[in-house]
């Protein structure tokens, strides 16, 4: 009998933790006993059953959430961290180097300490391999890794929309992004501005003018494929839906649509989760909900000499939990797409 990988989820009562568990329950490795779901932890929710927070996870609904302590995490092969920013580093440094730790927070995403200091209050903890396999060189860095930083949801949508054009030098490096996100992207903590009466029938811009924390991460990703000085003007907007990100990315260009589409076809033809829409079709969030897919469309406004890329992802799947499971598969040497669907649940 082969050895079963034992998995723990820290922050299991949150949206990211719950979505990781949903994907693990549907993973072939769980079905054929290559993977078992071990300890589930939470902070304020410790002592509750998982079903009190995620009633849809019926096979695990009876499980009791434990306090996040090193003693209950010992002996696990894989630990997913779904903690608030600034809380992962202290826990991660106490887990052994042989443990595969996959952090869904921001603690280890940025490679530049200065960039971290501009956006986060906690001390810089360093960087880990970045869990975006579609980034050039990213897949190789994740294979056999034991520490992985899951990308932010906005950077995932935006980088997938821009990387091929930026890599081929087909657009100017000054990028403007307008992106809308479902409310789950803001987490599960109780906040007045996230109450139903505040968000239903309303859209709200936030952290504009270069103040959103994901801006540094987007620039970092684009600099992987270009030596030019990249700037990103990013405007995020919360919309009254649970899931989904739709990002509209623009930049000046003198390239033809044909040349741009060729670059995207070349970059994504072998990617299992990135789908370049047929010319004339546009992504929408409903088509990717529940899936690990990213739908991309590109266009050129010739009169304005402007390139437009539109991307749609599920912020909780490709934007968080799906990327975490995709990274786990690569790190463990399993098929990358195992347990992950490209089929959404629209309408």
UniProtKB/Swiss-Prot annotation:
A GO cellular component term found in this entry reads: cytoplasm
Does the UniProt entry include the keyword Signal?
no
Pfam families the UniProt entry points to? Semialdhyde_dh, Semialdhyde_dhC_1
- Gene3D superfamilies, sorted: Dihydrodipicolinate Reductase, domain 2, NAD(P)-binding Rossmann-like Domain
User: Per its UniProt entry, which superkingdom is the organism in?
Assistant: Bacteria
According to UniProt, the reaction catalysed is: N-acetyl-L-glutamate 5-semialdehyde + phosphate + NADP(+) = N-acetyl-L-glutamyl 5-phosphate + NADPH + H(+)
- Uppermost EC category: oxidoreductase
Q: Which cysteines are joined by disulfide bonds?
A: none
UniProt keyword list: Amino-acid biosynthesis, Arginine biosynthesis, Cytoplasm, NADP, Oxidoreductase
**Gene Ontology BP terms:** L-arginine biosynthetic process
Question: Pathway, per Swiss-Prot/TrEMBL?
Answer: Amino-acid biosynthesis; L-arginine biosynthesis; N(2)-acetyl-L-ornithine from L-glutamate: step 3/4
The protein's Enzyme Commission number: 1.2.1.38
CDD domains per the record? Answer: AGPR_1_actinobacAGPR_like, AGPR_1_C
- What residues sit in the active site? 153
Protein purpose = Catalyzes the NADPH-dependent reduction of N-acetyl-5-glutamyl phosphate to yield N-acetyl-L-glutamate 5-semialdehyde.
What the record says about family reads: Belongs to the NAGSA dehydrogenase family. Type 1 subfamily.
The record's annotation in NCBIfam families points to: argC
Q: What is this protein called?
A: N-acetyl-gamma-glutamyl-phosphate reductase
State the organism named in the record: Mycobacterium leprae (strain TN)
